[in-house]
């Protein structure tokens, strides 16, 4: 009986096992034979991703539409998150970097600014700030207690290698640092399967080919195309153009609400910064299907990117190049004539601003020394570019990154004398025919002042009227009538003409400073004295103005009292050609009499057209009349072996003004040393380099004086 029951159980179990096995066989047949192909395809897991289409930045062009900043297409390398383990990610990164390096490509990383290698040290963003260093260390640690372990850069390096990124001992320290660079960006900027991280831009086609050929080694690595910024004739336009760069953490915090991402680029200086809202495009999107390795299998749909707006400047490219070339050439020439008495061979920098007197358009804006903005487009691991940037940053003597045209503040010297004359004329202190007898010296407020020619043993100017005083730049004339006019009235007119006041130009500008009672009290905590007025009246003492203010000032002299807002942006257009913005000339009318302007014009014409004029040599045989003024302000360091600065202002044609020019050369020795620079600019503007000029460019007879 028991044996029969046992046999029954055995048969039952056998039947059950047979049924289970049969089910398995049926399923296998179904999976592998009947639906094998379909199931094989489904086994390749598919992901749907939303990928960004990067919009091209708007171009920047000159007034004639000649591009200065444009774009080209370049390949980028991105990493999307996959299921790779940490050791596999690290190995993949080092393989990618080796490909980059073999083809001369650079890769991106924010770590360069915080931790460097060879030597291992803190980067430029934290090496001079204990507060920034502590904040950074707190942000990067896994546990708060770990901060106490990070006392040196070497500690941070070890922490990153061993704890944070678990980098295998088989890698050298240099290889480990390279892995850290990419892993750091993965950590800080974040990346997911649907939001890949860009690790390299504008890579060589060889890099693209090698990555694609070995795609099985690089799961999640994507190749895409993005517009890359390109600068044309970059050094000539550097200070106007500026450059773009990756968002800093501070910029990102301020801009993320506007849709910016941490790995985006933004205008950092110049028009790139000033016109950021115009130039930035709107990124598009595409929905794609990818396999588990991140390879694209299908593009489902897309929303195209909208390019940024194109910005057209008031700058004329040819005029800009002439201004830059002439500025550099004349600085070298001044330097070469060192006599180590007055000229100490230290001329090294300067600026030129040319302005349309009838609408405020800036026609040229040159600042020297210049820099190459293209180096700021390179990757952070581009050693040559980083070296160049470091040179620019550390050049405290020449400061090439400073736009002297809007940020340089210079004592004006004698180019200020027309303002003193305007104040004296408008306030009824003098007429154009009021005579001053220059005996070579005078005592004002207990201080003795000398005529420059008298001091140089050439004899004083004797009797002079306004025209002669401007032509010969007689200090004694302006000392005397400046004191009689008074500092308050002189300062009032200087302010009306925009000196020591922001001009409103699009670029970041210095305000400058005017010599007056308030300024002296604030700077020196001292009362004003008559001798202070005497010095201020000839453009010395606390007076300090930017070249763009000086160009604006001479423009007002030229057009008879219209103070325009200087501007660099002429027009903004959409990619389809429709106009987004068009500059409309704005001006304030200065309440100055026509007779006053005429008297100043006569004196400034005499500067360039009389035998005794301080710029007569430069404009001898010039085919039309130029109204001008030279300035040789003292810096206070002449006794220490430093040359005086040199300044020059002009407008032309004097009888029908079109253009105003202001020139500054630091340590340029004499004001008339800068006149050839203005002459070159005027020649180019009026087409004289091709020996063509129009009927309104008519020469006048030489002005002659009688004493």
Put a short name on every predicted segment.
Residues 1-305, 329-351, 357, 370:
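Membrane-proximal periplasmic segments of bacterial cell-envelope enzymes
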Residues 75, 87-94, 98, 205, ...:
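Solvent-exposed, polar/charged alpha-helical surfaces in well-ordered, non-transmembrane soluble domains
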